[in-house]
Amino acid sequence: MSWRWQRWLLPGVVAVYAAMRVYRGAAICMDGDEIFSVGVAAHTWGGLLRAVGQDSIHPPLFYFLLKLWVAIGGDSLFWTRLLPTLFSTLAIVPMVLLGREFQLRPVVISTTVGLAAIHPYLLYYSQHVRMYTLLMLCALTSLWVFHACIRPGRRTEASKFAILTLVNIVSVYSHYYGWLVIGLECWYLIFWKREYLRRMAASCAVVFLAFIPWIYWAGKYIYAKGGLASNLEWIQKPDAGALAWFFVDLAGFGDFPFIGRQAVTGLALLVLAAGYAAWRERAKLHAGHFVYMARFLLYFVLGSVAVAFTASRLLPNSVWGHRHMVYLVFPMLMLVTAAYYQLNSPAVRITGGILCAVWASMVIQHHLKGDDKKTPFDSLVIQMLAQEADNPGSVTFYSVDKYLHYPVWFYLETLKAGKITGFATPLPADRAKLAAGAARIVVRNHVNIEEAKGAHFWVGYSSAWPGKLSPEAILTARGCRAGADVTVRDRYHSSTIFPVWCAE
């Protein structure tokens, strides 16, 4: 491929990258985490700060930006999900600039972006109204500016570190994992570039000073609730299996759980084959900047995973999460793509090409089918209201599940307010009737099944229900009549609601 065509390739793959994220962006309703985001952003500025302080586990920047975003374009599902899509697309810029600093050919950079365009792990969080793509944008920008700081350039050393300081301030206000990136940058200098340590120490001091207001604000709420255990207790400590699955996810096979161990085995064999080919052609790998680039990228990829894994094992509560390290997708893809073009081994070229083609076809087919990781809770609410359309009285909804009440309550409150926030299911034309129906539903949170009483009510539960008998069977044994249920599913769970009539 000529250099002229290589340069035109990048705008094309960027367009595909953006289109893949816009496509079906509003096909499924918001989940509980996204609902929390828009709920926080709906507060006044003071109320937003209090809500984020009470939550404590995420800094406030994303919520500020989401509030401004909604003020500009409204709260429709499509518009709100455009914000993480925008952050994800902007993250291409620092990664391309970093690739150019590594003197990678345009075809290598374009291929990296092309693979990222259809990467399922990255696609999912690019359509998820949370702060993870903002963290990715900040982390990748930090890596690019950090690399520029330790390389000769036209700007002065002081000005480059000043820019890095500003970027890192934004980064730590986007997510606490921003501190992980900063820490790895410091250790990189200790290992390889100690002459820049003084500048970096000053930069870190300024970042810390800028973060003190949030430490004080969140610290008040953390102290009042006795720590962060209530926020983090649901996160399991990672084991070797979780670590292996993270790399399966990072490689782009996480959306295909049916592959299971075969994916891990296949990836291990591919790594071994690539390693053998690299050893055979080690002279070519040492040509140019490949070894330097590989060291830089691998350090941040493996360092991020190692620190997160170790901290999660040692701390009282785990901080492990694939979503927190979505920023590693681009560096990993750049490293693999650069190695692919650097090696001339026919075995690696053919194997890599076949694997990439099979993977791409599976990913595109999966994306065209739609997201199966989120539950269509809005459908539950609409169907419940449809069945209660002729009932003029109030009805209680008992959630015997710990989490189901939250989305049901949110979508009812949204309809009561005459809004469409988070809805993907088509709504009936008579919005006033819909709002009146929603106002008649009273939601009870996480109750015991024995507390579900009345002449007529609804019950909701999920596939996490622990009892031997289903809620329908328990209520039927009590002498009540359970109506036909409404069930919705995602890849991992199902949620069910059903009406009940009991003799008074």
Write out the residue ranges for each language-model feature.
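Membrane-proximal helix-loop-helix interfaces that form the catalytic/acceptor-binding platform
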Residues: 5-153, 157-503
